[in-house]
Amino acid sequence: MIEFGNFYQLIAKNHLSHWLETLPAQIAAWQREQQHGLFKQWSNAVEFLPEMTPWRLDLLHSVTAESETPLSEGQLKRIDTLLRNLMPWRKGPFSLYGVDIDTEWRSDWKWDRVLPHLSDLTGRTILDVGCGSGYHLWRMIGAGAHLAVGIDPTQLFLCQFEAVRKLLGNDQRAHLLPLGIEQLPALKAFDTVFSMGVLYHRRSPLEHLWQLKDQLVNEGELVLETLVVDGDENTVLVPGDRYAQMRNVYFIPSAPALKKWLEKCGFIDVRIADVCVTTTEEQRRTEWMVTESLADFLDPNDRSKTVEGYPAPQRAVLIARKP
């Protein structure tokens, strides 16, 4: 059973303590009523993983854990099999005692694009909205964060996160909660808030920006990464039924339009830090994610377009500050 008591004890002693007025009841309701049909199978995979304490742990350059002496073939096989029971692995990669999880996304590439533009994360309390398996939570800790909290309602991601945590020595500096941003009160408690790969899935993107702002302390920093299209501050793509085979894509603004949205929501010092086209080297099918990936979502005769005829995915990073 995945428990959250350690997190409750941790925040009871800091400036997140007021979250305890609502959070335990929400988690209890989730445990009673909302668990996925495969959750028991996934949580069993986590439970059966061995307790490991890394001899060498690198969260600064990657997410890598090593033992002092190589694991036996049987130990490696056990870890590998249990981690494969948590497929598909979308966000990573992870290197855990000789088991290399080659995830669909090279999330380390995204981190390398984002990191140079951030305020120093040393000592910061961070929220990562839609954090997936929690890969970036560990990289935030590697960059000096005091506490990294991720929220994502996808229960497979929770189990993947807890599996990695167990293999990292039960590290308590990062935590993942199975919640959506709309379930959080206005905590106004995080020094940095990340929203990466979420905005285009929201029916009301400006409401999402307000929700993110409500989580930041005054002078806190927002890091927003999302799909964009080319154009000026009035350009927004509203896809039809699907975009790159995804049904739940609602609004894809240009980077200048997104900057304007942030300013309309009251953010200041808004800047476009990076814009780049997503490549089939960064998002692709692997043995840890065996279904369709980006190459299958692009027009085979014109890779600058999706199969639906829209511009192929490009992503922007915007940095903003709450006054």
Curated annotation (Swiss-Prot):
It catalyses: carboxy-S-adenosyl-L-methionine + 5-hydroxyuridine(34) in tRNA = 5-carboxymethoxyuridine(34) in tRNA + S-adenosyl-L-homocysteine + H(+). Keywords: Transferase, tRNA processing. InterPro entries: CmoB, Mo5U34_MeTrfas-like, SAM-dependent_MTases_sf. Its EC number is 2.5.1.-. Carboxy-S-adenosyl-L-methionine binds at K91, W105, K110, G130, D152, P153, T154, I181, E182, M196, Y200, R315. Gene3D superfamilies: Vaccinia Virus protein VP39. GO terms for molecular function: methyltransferase activity; transferase activity, transferring alkyl or aryl (other than methyl) groups. It comes from the Bacteria. Coiled coil: none annotated. One of its GO terms (biological process) is tRNA wobble uridine modification. Belongs to the class I-like SAM-binding methyltransferase superfamily. CmoB family. Homotetramer. NCBIfam families: PRK15068.1, tRNA 5-methoxyuridine(34)/uridine 5-oxyacetic acid(34) synthase CmoB. Catalyzes carboxymethyl transfer from carboxy-S-adenosyl-L-methionine (Cx-SAM) to 5-hydroxyuridine (ho5U) to form 5-carboxymethoxyuridine (cmo5U) at position 34 in tRNAs. This is tRNA U34 carboxymethyltransferase. It comes from Salmonella newport (strain SL254). The gene is cmoB.
